[in-house]
């Protein structure tokens, strides 16, 4: 879309962990290496969680006169992300990525064995469900 329409890209994410850089700055370097012009990349580097991503991104969108943004994030995280943008008064067009799907969706008895990956996926789902509840009803 950026190449075809020349629209800007807003990257959101600060330095979440002490031993890394700001997520938006890292992503900006990747986009530039893929040929996206630097002047078409906006960055928000203060946020450390989804609520802040939405709040600080909404400010940048308004400052730059941008409306109708396309929100790109992991599919499991999309519902809560959209809620956070709605709380900021920004209607986004969701574009989920990074779906978690089975590689071989055929039943086999070995799939009944406990697997570490499945446990981690369950933890992710539970965390996201709880965070969505908090976003919707408490924050």
Give the positions of each predicted feature.
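A structural signal for short, hydrophobic/glycine-enriched beta-strand patches
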Residues: 1-112
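Short, surface-exposed alpha-helical recognition segments that flank or form part
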Residues: 45-49, 117-124
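A transmembrane-helix-recognition feature enriched in membrane-embedded lipid enzymes
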Residues: 121-139
């Amino acid at each position: 879309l950026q190449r075809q329409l020349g629209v800007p890209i807003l990257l959101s994410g600060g330095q979440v962990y002490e031993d890394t850089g700001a997520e938006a700055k890292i992503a900006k370097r990747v986009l530039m290496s893929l040929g996206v012009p630097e002047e078409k990349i906006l960055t928000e580097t203060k946020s450390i969680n989804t609520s802040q991503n939405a709040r600080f991104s909404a400010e940048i969108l308004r400052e730059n006169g941008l409306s109708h943004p396309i929100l790109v994030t992991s599919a499991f995280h999309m519902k809560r992300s959209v809620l956070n943008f709605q709380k900021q008064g920004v209607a986004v067009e969701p574009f989920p990525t990074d779906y978690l799907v089975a590689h071989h969706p055929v039943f086999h008895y070995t799939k009944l064995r406990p697997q570490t990956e499945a446990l981690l996926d369950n933890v992710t789902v539970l965390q996201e469900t709880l965070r969505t509840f908090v976003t919707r009803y408490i924050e």
